[in-house]
Protein backbone atom coordinates (compact mmCIF):
# COMPACT_ATOMS: atom_id res chain seq x y z
CA UNK A 1 0.00 0.00 0.00
CA UNK A 2 2.81 2.36 0.95
CA UNK A 3 4.61 1.49 -2.29
CA UNK A 4 1.46 2.22 -4.31
CA UNK A 5 0.98 5.54 -2.54
CA UNK A 6 4.61 6.41 -3.19
CA UNK A 7 4.26 5.62 -6.90
CA UNK A 8 1.12 7.76 -7.17
CA UNK A 9 2.85 10.60 -5.36
CA UNK A 10 5.84 10.38 -7.69
CA UNK A 11 3.55 10.36 -10.74
CA UNK A 12 1.62 13.39 -9.51
CA UNK A 13 4.88 15.12 -8.73
CA UNK A 14 6.23 14.51 -12.22
CA UNK A 15 2.97 15.68 -13.81
CA UNK A 16 3.02 18.78 -11.65
CA UNK A 17 6.63 19.44 -12.66
CA UNK A 18 5.74 19.02 -16.33
CA UNK A 19 2.88 21.46 -16.00
CA UNK A 20 5.13 23.97 -14.30
CA UNK A 21 7.72 23.42 -17.02
CA UNK A 22 5.32 24.44 -19.80
CA UNK A 23 5.22 28.05 -20.98
CA UNK A 24 2.25 30.00 -22.32
CA UNK A 25 3.00 32.50 -25.06
CA UNK A 26 0.80 34.69 -27.28
CA UNK A 27 1.50 34.39 -30.98
CA UNK A 28 0.89 37.07 -33.62
CA UNK A 29 -2.66 35.89 -34.26
CA UNK A 30 -3.30 36.61 -30.55
CA UNK A 31 -3.60 32.90 -29.82
CA UNK A 32 -2.52 31.59 -26.42
CA UNK A 33 -0.13 28.70 -27.09
CA UNK A 34 1.34 26.33 -24.51
CA UNK A 35 4.87 25.24 -25.39
CA UNK A 36 7.48 23.14 -23.57
CA UNK A 37 9.91 24.86 -21.26
CA UNK A 38 12.76 24.05 -23.63
CA UNK A 39 12.53 23.60 -27.39
CA UNK A 40 14.79 20.89 -28.80
CA UNK A 41 12.88 20.02 -31.97
CA UNK A 42 11.20 22.86 -33.85
CA UNK A 43 9.70 22.71 -37.33
CA UNK A 44 9.63 26.02 -39.21
CA UNK A 45 7.13 26.28 -42.08
CA UNK A 46 7.66 29.98 -42.75
CA UNK A 47 10.78 31.37 -44.43
CA UNK A 48 10.74 34.69 -42.55
CA UNK A 49 10.80 32.89 -39.20
CA UNK A 50 13.51 30.57 -40.50
CA UNK A 51 15.72 33.51 -41.46
CA UNK A 52 15.26 35.10 -38.04
CA UNK A 53 15.98 31.78 -36.31
CA UNK A 54 19.24 31.49 -38.26
CA UNK A 55 20.24 34.97 -37.08
CA UNK A 56 19.37 34.01 -33.50
CA UNK A 57 21.74 31.02 -33.86
CA UNK A 58 18.87 28.63 -33.17
CA UNK A 59 19.27 26.12 -36.01
CA UNK A 60 20.52 23.40 -33.66
CA UNK A 61 16.97 23.41 -32.27
CA UNK A 62 15.34 22.99 -35.72
CA UNK A 63 14.60 19.58 -37.26
CA UNK A 64 12.31 20.49 -40.16
CA UNK A 65 11.74 23.37 -42.59
CA UNK A 66 9.36 24.41 -45.36
CA UNK A 67 9.81 22.61 -48.66
CA UNK A 68 10.53 25.67 -50.82
CA UNK A 69 12.90 27.46 -48.46
CA UNK A 70 15.58 27.75 -51.15
CA UNK A 71 13.21 29.52 -53.53
CA UNK A 72 11.91 31.81 -50.80
CA UNK A 73 15.30 32.68 -49.29
CA UNK A 74 17.37 32.56 -52.47
CA UNK A 75 19.77 29.99 -53.89
CA UNK A 76 22.76 31.40 -52.00
CA UNK A 77 21.14 31.29 -48.56
CA UNK A 78 22.47 27.81 -47.91
CA UNK A 79 25.91 29.37 -47.50
CA UNK A 80 24.62 31.15 -44.41
CA UNK A 81 23.05 28.02 -42.92
CA UNK A 82 24.44 24.86 -44.55
CA UNK A 83 22.75 22.72 -41.91
CA UNK A 84 19.39 23.42 -43.57
CA UNK A 85 20.40 21.40 -46.63
CA UNK A 86 19.68 18.01 -45.06
CA UNK A 87 16.66 18.88 -42.95
CA UNK A 88 13.28 17.22 -43.40
CA UNK A 89 10.62 19.23 -45.25
CA UNK A 90 7.19 18.18 -43.95
CA UNK A 91 5.18 21.07 -45.37
CA UNK A 92 5.09 24.59 -46.72
CA UNK A 93 3.33 27.90 -46.13
CA UNK A 94 -0.12 26.50 -46.85
CA UNK A 95 -0.05 22.77 -46.11
CA UNK A 96 1.54 20.06 -44.01
CA UNK A 97 2.09 16.31 -44.36
CA UNK A 98 0.96 15.27 -40.92
CA UNK A 99 2.64 11.85 -41.04
CA UNK A 100 5.99 13.39 -41.99
CA UNK A 101 5.55 15.99 -39.28
CA UNK A 102 4.75 13.43 -36.59
CA UNK A 103 7.83 11.42 -37.55
CA UNK A 104 9.96 14.41 -36.52
CA UNK A 105 8.40 14.50 -33.02
CA UNK A 106 8.45 18.30 -32.91
CA UNK A 107 8.08 20.36 -29.75
CA UNK A 108 6.60 23.27 -31.73
CA UNK A 109 5.70 24.26 -35.29
CA UNK A 110 6.00 27.79 -36.65
CA UNK A 111 3.56 28.80 -39.40
CA UNK A 112 2.76 31.99 -41.26
CA UNK A 113 -0.12 34.15 -40.09
CA UNK A 114 -2.13 33.35 -43.23
CA UNK A 115 -1.72 29.58 -42.93
CA UNK A 116 -5.14 27.98 -43.52
CA UNK A 117 -7.10 27.44 -40.32
CA UNK A 118 -7.47 23.78 -41.34
CA UNK A 119 -3.68 23.44 -41.39
CA UNK A 120 -3.34 24.93 -37.91
CA UNK A 121 -6.13 22.67 -36.63
CA UNK A 122 -4.56 19.61 -38.26
CA UNK A 123 -1.32 20.19 -36.36
CA UNK A 124 -3.02 21.19 -33.11
CA UNK A 125 -5.24 18.09 -33.21
CA UNK A 126 -2.16 15.87 -32.80
CA UNK A 127 -1.15 17.90 -29.74
CA UNK A 128 1.70 19.83 -31.34
CA UNK A 129 1.84 23.54 -30.41
CA UNK A 130 1.50 25.94 -33.37
CA UNK A 131 2.96 29.46 -33.30
CA UNK A 132 1.86 31.88 -36.05
CA UNK A 133 4.16 34.73 -37.08
CA UNK A 134 3.13 37.83 -39.06
CA UNK A 135 5.87 40.37 -38.21
CA UNK A 136 3.23 43.07 -38.05
CA UNK A 137 0.56 44.44 -35.73
CA UNK A 138 -2.70 46.08 -36.72
CA UNK A 139 -6.44 45.72 -36.67
CA UNK A 140 -7.81 42.42 -35.35
CA UNK A 141 -9.62 41.55 -38.56
CA UNK A 142 -6.43 41.92 -40.61
CA UNK A 143 -4.12 39.71 -38.54
CA UNK A 144 -4.64 36.53 -40.56
CA UNK A 145 -4.47 38.14 -43.99
CA UNK A 146 -1.67 37.98 -46.54
CA UNK A 147 -2.66 41.37 -47.95
CA UNK A 148 -3.91 43.47 -45.02
CA UNK A 149 -5.39 46.95 -44.86
CA UNK A 150 -3.42 48.87 -42.24
CA UNK A 151 -4.26 52.25 -40.74
CA UNK A 152 -0.61 53.00 -39.98
CA UNK A 153 1.65 50.76 -42.06
CA UNK A 154 4.92 52.05 -40.63
CA UNK A 155 3.87 51.47 -37.02
CA UNK A 156 2.33 48.09 -37.87
CA UNK A 157 5.55 46.74 -39.37
CA UNK A 158 7.96 48.43 -36.94
CA UNK A 159 6.08 47.14 -33.90
CA UNK A 160 5.33 43.81 -35.55
CA UNK A 161 8.92 43.05 -36.50
CA UNK A 162 10.11 43.86 -32.98
CA UNK A 163 7.32 41.76 -31.47
CA UNK A 164 7.97 38.89 -33.87
CA UNK A 165 11.72 38.76 -33.24
CA UNK A 166 11.13 38.84 -29.49
CA UNK A 167 8.53 36.08 -29.74
CA UNK A 168 10.74 33.78 -31.83
CA UNK A 169 13.64 34.50 -29.47
CA UNK A 170 11.44 33.66 -26.48
CA UNK A 171 10.42 30.31 -27.95
CA UNK A 172 14.05 29.37 -28.63
CA UNK A 173 15.28 30.88 -25.32
CA UNK A 174 17.50 33.34 -27.17
CA UNK A 175 16.49 36.56 -25.43
CA UNK A 176 19.89 38.24 -25.56
CA UNK A 177 20.31 37.50 -29.25
CA UNK A 178 16.76 38.70 -29.87
CA UNK A 179 17.36 41.99 -28.08
CA UNK A 180 20.56 42.54 -30.05
CA UNK A 181 18.83 41.73 -33.33
CA UNK A 182 16.02 44.20 -32.64
CA UNK A 183 18.54 46.90 -31.76
CA UNK A 184 20.55 46.26 -34.93
CA UNK A 185 17.45 46.23 -37.13
CA UNK A 186 16.47 49.78 -36.21
CA UNK A 187 19.97 51.21 -35.74
CA UNK A 188 20.12 53.13 -39.04
CA UNK A 189 16.65 54.63 -39.17
CA UNK A 190 17.88 57.94 -37.71
CA UNK A 191 20.68 58.11 -40.28
CA UNK A 192 18.15 57.80 -43.09
CA UNK A 193 15.74 60.29 -41.57
CA UNK A 194 18.51 62.84 -41.03
CA UNK A 195 19.89 62.53 -44.56
CA UNK A 196 16.57 62.32 -46.43
CA UNK A 197 14.21 64.34 -44.28
CA UNK A 198 14.19 67.27 -46.71
CA UNK A 199 13.21 65.17 -49.75
CA UNK A 200 9.65 66.26 -50.53
CA UNK A 201 7.02 63.77 -51.68
CA UNK A 202 7.10 65.03 -55.27
CA UNK A 203 10.90 64.64 -55.44
CA UNK A 204 11.03 61.03 -54.28
CA UNK A 205 12.37 58.56 -56.84
CA UNK A 206 9.57 56.70 -58.60
CA UNK A 207 10.38 53.02 -58.06
CA UNK A 208 8.88 49.70 -59.12
CA UNK A 209 9.51 46.28 -57.60
CA UNK A 210 9.65 43.62 -60.34
CA UNK A 211 8.87 40.07 -59.26
CA UNK A 212 8.47 37.10 -61.64
CA UNK A 213 5.46 37.11 -63.98
CA UNK A 214 4.80 40.81 -63.42
CA UNK A 215 4.09 40.34 -59.74
CA UNK A 216 4.61 43.38 -57.54
CA UNK A 217 3.78 44.81 -54.11
CA UNK A 218 1.32 47.63 -53.57
CA UNK A 219 0.05 49.17 -50.35
CA UNK A 220 -0.08 47.27 -47.08
CA UNK A 221 3.31 45.58 -47.50
CA UNK A 222 6.77 46.34 -46.11
CA UNK A 223 8.16 46.79 -49.65
CA UNK A 224 6.71 50.28 -50.00
CA UNK A 225 8.00 51.23 -46.55
CA UNK A 226 11.53 50.21 -47.49
CA UNK A 227 11.27 52.51 -50.50
CA UNK A 228 9.79 55.31 -48.39
CA UNK A 229 12.56 55.16 -45.78
CA UNK A 230 15.14 55.26 -48.59
CA UNK A 231 13.64 58.32 -50.29
CA UNK A 232 11.72 56.45 -52.98
CA UNK A 233 8.07 56.15 -53.91
CA UNK A 234 6.38 52.85 -54.75
CA UNK A 235 4.57 53.55 -58.02
CA UNK A 236 2.20 50.61 -57.47
CA UNK A 237 1.01 51.70 -54.03
CA UNK A 238 -1.71 54.09 -55.16
CA UNK A 239 -3.68 51.51 -57.16
CA UNK A 240 -2.51 48.06 -56.00
CA UNK A 241 -3.20 46.49 -52.60
CA UNK A 242 -0.87 43.80 -51.31
CA UNK A 243 0.94 41.40 -53.63
CA UNK A 244 -0.61 41.21 -57.07
CA UNK A 245 0.12 40.43 -60.69
CA UNK A 246 -0.07 43.51 -62.89
CA UNK A 247 0.21 44.12 -66.63
CA UNK A 248 3.04 45.60 -68.66
CA UNK A 249 0.60 48.37 -69.54
CA UNK A 250 0.41 49.23 -65.83
CA UNK A 251 4.19 49.50 -65.61
CA UNK A 252 4.36 51.59 -68.78
CA UNK A 253 1.77 53.96 -67.33
CA UNK A 254 3.65 54.22 -64.03
CA UNK A 255 6.94 54.77 -65.92
CA UNK A 256 9.27 54.18 -62.95
CA UNK A 257 12.69 55.85 -62.83
CA UNK A 258 14.14 52.82 -61.03
CA UNK A 259 13.24 49.13 -61.22
CA UNK A 260 14.29 46.83 -58.38
CA UNK A 261 14.59 43.04 -58.54
CA UNK A 262 15.04 40.89 -55.45
CA UNK A 263 18.15 38.75 -55.09
CA UNK A 264 16.04 35.59 -55.01
CA UNK A 265 14.68 36.29 -58.53
CA UNK A 266 17.82 37.06 -60.61
CA UNK A 267 16.31 35.80 -63.87
CA UNK A 268 13.87 38.71 -63.87
CA UNK A 269 16.64 41.19 -64.74
CA UNK A 270 17.58 39.75 -68.18
CA UNK A 271 13.91 39.12 -68.89
CA UNK A 272 13.22 42.83 -68.49
CA UNK A 273 16.36 44.00 -70.31
CA UNK A 274 15.74 41.73 -73.29
CA UNK A 275 12.03 42.49 -73.68
CA UNK A 276 11.47 45.40 -76.07
CA UNK A 277 8.12 46.03 -74.43
CA UNK A 278 10.00 47.54 -71.50
CA UNK A 279 12.44 49.61 -73.58
CA UNK A 280 10.65 52.98 -73.33
CA UNK A 281 10.37 52.93 -69.54
CA UNK A 282 12.56 55.58 -67.92
CA UNK A 283 14.46 53.06 -65.77
CA UNK A 284 15.53 51.17 -68.90
CA UNK A 285 16.60 54.33 -70.70
CA UNK A 286 18.71 55.39 -67.71
CA UNK A 287 20.04 51.87 -67.08
CA UNK A 288 18.60 51.77 -63.59
CA UNK A 289 17.37 48.21 -63.28
CA UNK A 290 19.01 46.98 -60.08
CA UNK A 291 19.40 43.44 -58.78
CA UNK A 292 19.32 43.93 -55.04
CA UNK A 293 21.86 42.29 -52.71
CA UNK A 294 20.60 39.40 -50.59
CA UNK A 295 20.34 41.52 -47.44
CA UNK A 296 18.06 44.09 -49.12
CA UNK A 297 14.99 41.92 -48.73
CA UNK A 298 12.24 44.18 -50.05
CA UNK A 299 9.65 41.54 -49.26
CA UNK A 300 6.06 41.99 -48.24
CA UNK A 301 7.11 41.08 -44.69
CA UNK A 302 10.01 42.93 -42.98
CA UNK A 303 13.31 41.28 -42.17
CA UNK A 304 15.83 42.70 -39.67
CA UNK A 305 18.64 42.92 -42.24
CA UNK A 306 16.31 44.68 -44.68
CA UNK A 307 15.83 47.50 -42.17
CA UNK A 308 19.41 47.51 -40.90
CA UNK A 309 21.16 47.27 -44.28
CA UNK A 310 18.73 47.10 -47.19
CA UNK A 311 17.20 50.51 -46.60
CA UNK A 312 20.68 52.04 -46.43
CA UNK A 313 21.72 50.25 -49.64
CA UNK A 314 18.69 51.60 -51.48
CA UNK A 315 19.14 55.13 -50.13
CA UNK A 316 22.81 55.08 -51.15
CA UNK A 317 21.90 53.78 -54.63
CA UNK A 318 19.30 56.51 -55.14
CA UNK A 319 21.12 59.39 -53.43
CA UNK A 320 24.86 58.59 -53.64
CA UNK A 321 25.97 62.15 -52.84
CA UNK A 322 24.10 62.14 -49.55
CA UNK A 323 25.70 58.90 -48.39
CA UNK A 324 29.27 59.18 -49.73
CA UNK A 325 30.72 58.90 -46.23
CA UNK A 326 28.72 55.79 -45.30
CA UNK A 327 30.88 52.66 -45.45
CA UNK A 328 28.16 50.22 -46.41
CA UNK A 329 30.61 47.36 -47.00
CA UNK A 330 31.80 47.56 -43.39
CA UNK A 331 28.26 47.95 -42.12
CA UNK A 332 27.16 44.83 -44.00
CA UNK A 333 30.14 42.72 -43.03
CA UNK A 334 29.84 43.67 -39.35
CA UNK A 335 26.17 42.63 -39.40
CA UNK A 336 26.92 39.33 -41.13
CA UNK A 337 29.72 38.50 -38.71
CA UNK A 338 27.48 39.16 -35.73
CA UNK A 339 24.24 37.52 -36.84
CA UNK A 340 25.18 35.03 -39.57
CA UNK A 341 28.62 34.27 -38.09
CA UNK A 342 30.29 34.57 -41.49
CA UNK A 343 31.50 37.22 -43.93
CA UNK A 344 29.25 38.74 -46.56
CA UNK A 345 29.97 37.53 -50.07
CA UNK A 346 28.24 39.57 -52.78
CA UNK A 347 26.90 37.73 -55.80
CA UNK A 348 25.93 39.77 -58.85
CA UNK A 349 23.84 42.41 -57.14
CA UNK A 350 24.34 46.12 -57.68
CA UNK A 351 26.48 47.50 -54.89
UniProtKB/Swiss-Prot annotation:
**Regulation of its activity:** The MolBCA complex shows a decrease in affinity in the presence of increasing concentrations of substrate and nucleotide.
The residue ranges of the Fe/B12 periplasmic-binding domain are 41-322
**Keywords of the record:** Ion transport, Molybdenum, Periplasm, Signal, Transport
Q: Where does molybdate bind?
A: 47-48, 217, 264, 300-301
Kindly indicate whether the keyword Signal belongs to this entry.
yes
InterPro entries for this protein: ABC_Transporter_SBP (IPR050902), ABC_transptr_periplasmic_BD (IPR002491)
Q: What is the top-level taxon of the source organism? A: Bacteria
GO CC terms of this entry: periplasmic space
Pfam families, per this entry?
Answer: Peripla_BP_2 (PF01497)
PROSITE patterns named among the record's database cross-references: FE_B12_PBP (PS50983)
SUPFAM superfamilies, sorted:
Helical backbone' metal receptor
Tell me the GO BP annotations in alphabetical order: cellular response to iron ion; monoatomic ion transport
Q: Does the keyword ATP-binding apply?
A: no
Signal peptide location: 1-21
Name where it's found: Periplasm
Complex and partners:
The complex is composed of two ATP-binding proteins (MolC), two transmembrane proteins (MolB) and a solute-binding protein (MolA).
**Similarity annotation:** Belongs to the bacterial solute-binding protein 8 family.
Record comment regarding domains: Nucleotide binding is coupled to a conformational shift at the periplasmic gate. This shift is akin to unlocking a swinging door: allowing just enough space for molybdate to slip into the cell. The lower cytoplasmic gate, identified as gate I, remains open throughout the MolBC-A mechanism, and cytoplasmic gate II closes in the presence of nucleotide.
Task: Relate the protein's function as given in its record.
Answer: Part of the ABC transporter complex MolBCA involved in molybdate import. Functions as a low-affinity molybdate transporter. Binds to both molybdate and tungstate, but not to sulfate or phosphate.
* Full protein name: Molybdate-binding protein MolA
UniProt organism field: Haemophilus influenzae (strain ATCC 51907 / DSM 11121 / KW20 / Rd)
